[in-house]
């Protein structure tokens, strides 16, 4: 199956962008317009990079497409590529990030509480979530800041590194998790789920056979 790189361009677009892989060194990077539900840019890549995303976005802008917003998975530096464009971090991917640090079954009370809080992302507002995250921090600050001393070197490190990473990820990304709420008139999606569904369709349609056959 051949992959077209460009499609008919709308005047305005809310971009959802991500890359899926069909094998080692064969990925498909897609920029989709959530307003029309159409892909605007599709290209084969070996690895996704911020430079490739920037190139694809700039190509659309050069064709006159007004990028009203963009939604992505939170790849480091990607949200900051175009500060003039409202950028939404996929809430589903944020929850996945927290689960990588805490697992889906944390052992500590603080971890369990933070995991349950992360699961409320899709249901609440920025103010409510921010207040709840601050309340969690105030309740568990002592535990979060516990340090373990290495008896041989005398140096110390945070005891609960994974918990700290999960908390700091939520705190650091807070401004990007509710962009859709700050721009209600644009109809920005809060996840990349619409594009994820298209990726599933691509895989069912046999794009992966291209990689298997070496085409």
Question: What annotation goes with each model-predicted range?
Answer:
Residues 1-76, 80-84, 173, 194:
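RNase H-like nuclease fold core
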Residues 19, 108, 128-130:
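Intrinsically disordered, low-complexity regions enriched in Ser/Pro/Gly/Gln/His and often acidic
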Residues 23, 88, 96-98, 104-105, ...:
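Short loop/turn segments at secondary-structure transitions that flank enzyme active sites
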Residues 33, 48, 108, 210-211:
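A short hydrophobic/aromatic micro-motif that marks alpha-helical segments and, especially, helix-coil
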Residues 65-76, 82, 116-215:
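Acidic/histidine-rich catalytic cores and adjacent linkers
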Residues 69-118:
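Conserved beta-strand -> loop -> alpha-helix junction used to position metal-binding or nucleic-acid-contacting
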